[in-house]
Amino acid sequence: GMCCGAGGARMWMEESIGTKVNDERAREAISTGASRVATACPFCYIGKRKLEKAIQRLPDSEGIVLEWKSFQLNPSLQTDPNQNTLTYLAETKGWTMEQTLQMTAQVTAMGKEEGLNFNFEKTAVANTKRSHRLLHLAKAYDCQNELKEQLFKVYFEEGKNIDDLETLLQCAEHAGIPQAEAKKVLDTHGFEEEIDQDVYESRLIGVQGVPFFVFDRKYGISGAQPDEVFDRTLQQALDEVK
């Protein structure tokens, strides 16, 4: 999988706009308003904010339900709190540090436009599997969006390790998940099947990168697209429901 952005940060992304999902099986696999995101992808944070703003701009946003699905860009990634994203990107992408700084500066500027403050110097390398366990638990407490926001915030803006138990429990508490429940899920490798199912569904509908947003089971937006793409696609999906 890859991260999807827009504009200058092209090496980090792939994109296709307003895709119509035609495959019947694939459509059955997608719930209304499902968003596939990786917890440690900057474009997912930007895309989340763009989607929220697009929903706010709608004249009638009553009844819109958001559901977050899991997608791991690198499932085998080893957590290393001592390595920051800059050195990790340079090593894995084969970029010079100058290229890496240029790339992350573009992403930081994109984030600024949405009111987000990326801090790639502080962001540590972390496996996100445990954060996805919590994301599935959050569904039961109707606080997926709050948890997702919290995970993005502590990871990208505060440089916290999102594979760390304390950090995850703090995020869970902030979102409204009881500590005992959160701890149990993290201790027992909960929601393994659900995470695998999300990944399977992603493959079924041909998701190449994240974020990938699906509206009303048939319209897809790949990447942190321009606002008008979100506006147009949301409106299109809503018009068909009415």
Q: Can you name each region flagged by the protein language model?
A:
Residues 1, 26, 87, 108, ...:
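Short glycine-/small-residue-rich flexible loop motifs, especially phosphate/cofactor-binding loops
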Residues 1-42:
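Cofactor-cradling patches in redox/metallo enzymes
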Residues 2-8, 112-113, 176-178:
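Short, basic/glycine-rich phosphate-binding loops at helix/coil junctions
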Residues 20, 24, 28, 46, ...:
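A non-catalytic, amphipathic alpha-helix used as a structural packing/dimerization or gating element
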Residues 46-64, 136-242:
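C-terminal cap of thioredoxin/glutaredoxin-like
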Residues 50-155:
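Structural alpha/beta surface segment adjacent to cysteine/selenocysteine redox centers
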